[in-house]
């Protein structure tokens, strides 16, 4: 399954692609926002950060059984530093634990593939692509 997202800013595109991952797994119209989870990711370069971000979101969903409705970034550092430190982000996810009776589960996602990952910038903002293994 292919995911793609665009945004005027990089953080907007990262938000949209993560919400796309969650929406591919559970119908977001059935998810409330009574609980939160924190997700942190880091990577050397934007494709590595994107992969780590989606893997962490997938972990929260598949292992912790959490369905996400919305998210916001507390930290979004994507400017390379002189010391070569990894890019990093920290987000607060809003949603709730998956309830098979209330939530319409759409797909079981096994992995985020490194193949097909891309982060591109253009005059209208950013475009992200990722492949999910079902």
Predicted regions and their residues:
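N-terminal intrinsically disordered, cationic/polar leader segments
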Residues: 1-7, 11-134
């Amino acid at each position: 399954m292919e995911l793609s997202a665009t945004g005027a800013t990089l953080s907007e595109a990262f938000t949209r692609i993560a919400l796309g991952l969650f929406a591919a797994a559970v119908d977001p119209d059935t998810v409330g926002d009574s609980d939160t989870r924190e997700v942190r990711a880091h990577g050397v370069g934007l494709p590595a950060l994107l992969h780590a971000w989606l893997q962490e979101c997938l972990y929260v969903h598949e292992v912790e059984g959490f369905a996400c409705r919305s998210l916001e970034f507390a930290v979004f550092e994507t400017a390379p530093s002189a010391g070569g430190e990894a890019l990093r982000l920290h987000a607060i996810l809003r949603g709730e634990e998956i309830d098979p009776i209330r939530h319409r589960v759409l797909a079981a996602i096994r992995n985020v593939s490194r193949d097909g990952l891309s982060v591109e910038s253009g005059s209208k903002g950013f475009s992200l692509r990722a492949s999910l293994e079902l």
